[in-house]
């Protein structure tokens, strides 16, 4: 069992928290807003377009910018699994024009509450993330003897100089963890919490 710290309590952070809890880890979610998943409430004009009822391949064909970025994610968790997850959490779904999937209730809040249920078992702490806590790695040991023929010497690729061991909160408190996952979103909607904290980290 690992101590997992997830920075950001939006849709991605709550999904990650639920998955980590199910793998038996101790999970803490750091969320700087009063209410986790707040941006979910404004998606799909307040209805939340959960996914599209299509294959992963069809989905990727409609991604205009850098679809390759989503290959592994959609390969592991295609739209059908997303629908299955929410239906398993008690959300009744419907498919509308353009194969868009919405909750029958037409309320994004239902999706937010479902994700909170999925993340049950994780501790949600209301604090922001100010900095990553880094621990220097010991330098790699040099080989005992250099090869006689310099043509056979392979240039070493530089590795990471440090590893992340936690986060310093805006409150001044430090949160230590074995694994740190940054799921802060971008700068799309600052009033809902998307304030670019991940970029600054």
Identify what each model region corresponds to.
Residues 12, 35, 130:
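Conserved Rossmann-like nucleotide-cofactor binding loop
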Residues 70-80, 97-117, 189-197:
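Short beta-strand to alpha-helix junction loop
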Residues 2-29:
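N-terminal Rossmann-like FAD-binding beta1-loop-alpha1 element of flavoenzymes
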Residues 21-45:
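Glycine-rich FAD pyrophosphate-binding loop
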Residues 25, 91, 122:
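Short phosphate-binding/catalytic loops that engage adenosine nucleotides
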Residues 110, 114-201:
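Predominantly flavin-linked oxidoreductase catalytic cores and closely associated redox partners
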Residues 93-98, 181-184:
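Short beta-strands and strand-loop turn motifs
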Residues 47-95:
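Glycine-rich active-site loop/strand segments that organize a redox cofactor
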